[in-house]
Amino acid sequence: MQSVQQRLPSLIGDPIAFAHRGAKAHAPENTLEAFALALRLGANGLETDMWRTADGHIVLDHDGIVKRWGRSRPISEVPLTALPSHIPTLEKFYEEIGTDFHFSIDVKDEDAYESIVRISSESSFDLSRLWLCHHKVDVTVRNRGIYPDVRFVDSTRLSRMKEGPERRCALLLEHGVDTLNMHHSDWNGGLVTLAHKFELFAFSWDMQFEHVMTNHFRMGVDAVYSDYVDRLVDVYSVEVGHVPTKSQPG
């Protein structure tokens, strides 16, 4: 990928630096320890995955599989009391970590949207900083119409857009979806400009190396996801001109 020499404007005045599964490179992923550490290191956004237990609780975990006594079972088939203690509920997350950050959630259970939005609202989380991600665009579009106060994110890959990126962006704009989220290797300056033309935020994930982060900030992306919060904050400070802040999206 050709490097970008001058930083192009993002739609968000101060881009979001998302700590992927908390400070995953520094602490066990998706734990309260990892999330607290990510904020101490300077991230202004946290990212996680959410599932619903058999008894209806929303919990934070990536794989959604519980291994006990040599057996693997989906979290959806296990009650909360049978989960390992390191897996927090969404209520516990807000209680321990607070609300002063952007929050990106990969929704792994399509029936979890209502509970996620309700619990976030009851915890006084600013819903304009709640970014709900899903890999199926039809699921995202459907829920966009149900929950108007939160942010919706189409998490996809360029290779999966059979209609092409311009038509996908037009579809997202038509249905009020806020964001196009792709792997960093899918983005280039032209595609970031295209997303912005359709009034979409451009999010880029899996950025682990400084030169990749630098190039994407200069492309004008609106958010980046990384396991290495220390690297991310350092590059952010150089390219944006200050440490990450909690500013609102445009």
Placement of each model-derived feature along the sequence:
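C-terminal active-site rim and adjoining tail of enzyme catalytic domains
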Residues: 84-87, 154-250
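Conserved, mostly hydrophobic/aromatic
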Residues: 20, 38, 49, 83, ...
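Active-site beta-loop-alpha junctions enriched in small/polar residues
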Residues: 22, 51-53, 63-64, 108-110, ...
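An active-site metal/cofactor-coordinating segment within enzyme catalytic domains
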Residues: 7-17, 44, 50-102, 108, ...
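Short helix-capping segments at alpha-helix termini
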Residues: 100, 122-128, 145-150, 197-198, ...
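Structural preference for beta-strand elements that scaffold enzyme active sites
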Residues: 16-18, 45, 102-104, 129-132, ...
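Catalytic domains of carbohydrate-active enzymes, especially glycoside hydrolases
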Residues: 34-52, 93, 172-180
